[in-house]
Amino acid sequence: MKSKKGLTLTITLGTLALFLSGCVQTTKAGKPYGFVYEYLAKPGQNVMEWLSQLFGNNYGWAIIGLTVIVRLVLLPMMINQQRKSTYQQEKMSAVRPQMEKIQARQKAATTQEEKAAISNELMQLYRDNGISMTGGIGCLPLLIQLPIFSALYYAIRYSPELSKATFMGISLGKSSLILAILAFLSYLAQGYLSMIGLPEEQKKTMRLMLIMSPVMILFVSMSAPAGLGLYFFVGGLFACLQTLIINFFRPRIRREVEAELKKHPIKTPTPTQPKPINATESKPSHPRPQNNAGRGRNAGKQQRHHK
């Protein structure tokens, strides 16, 4: 289930990279214009200028403040989704023995009809036991942040004050390898924390996606202004906090799943046998009636001919 979350994050970051590649148009003189600039970049500049005044005209702390505000607003929603995902993980662990038996039969199947029937049986196992294929993961929090990413990116790019600002010696208007690596490490740590307490088999399936997401963040941060890398870094720290909260509640979630399974034991679907391919092409049980009348007429003609 966590791998689906990693895939969702990877797709969103890929969409972000495409979205940031060239949405704001500029005149020959280099002046920006267009829908994205008017409704995202300019409001983003105003928000950043207001926040910087609260932090003593420090745009770095303004970006951190913006990240904290956004993450605090999204925190209940993201914790709720992560809790649902953890609940689905525990239910998936409970049905794993039945699931592995079905998958073993699917590997041993020799025809497409057998494989399709066993695949339907696996889907029936999920439906009967209330297991969601999406794992309770939604992309709404990431989609909400997409306009914020864009606003921050273009605000830094087209605002003279923001593009020339520095934070701890790092220019916020230029890409920073240090902040890109810090963002990468923060999300890598979040992925490691999310695997604590999971079965070893489940960890193996999660590792690839949990590495892909930080790598995507690394590449986006390296190609974007350092201000966006700072946003990702602080966001990764909040993601670690979310995961620690979920890990704290994991034993309680596991007890909830165990209590539910006591009331509603795991339902195992009846194995279905595929229909043979030639079932509809079998020969009829009764022989086809022969045309005796025609045979009699032919016999009479033959007798007259011999006479």
UniProtKB/Swiss-Prot annotation:
Stretches that traverse the bilayer: 59-79, 136-156, 177-197, 205-225, 226-246
InterPro entries according to UniProt: YidC/ALB3/OXA1/COX18, YidC/Oxa/ALB_C, YidC/YidC1/YidC2_Firmicutes, YidC_ALB_C
Lipid-modified residues, N-palmitoyl cysteine kind: C23
PROSITE patterns reported in the protein's UniProt record: PROKAR_LIPOPROTEIN
Gene Ontology, cellular component aspect: plasma membrane
Signal peptide feature range: 1-22
Role this protein plays: Required for the insertion and/or proper folding and/or complex formation of integral membrane proteins into the membrane. Involved in integration of membrane proteins that insert both dependently and independently of the Sec translocase complex, as well as at least some lipoproteins.
Protein name (database record): Membrane protein insertase YidC 1
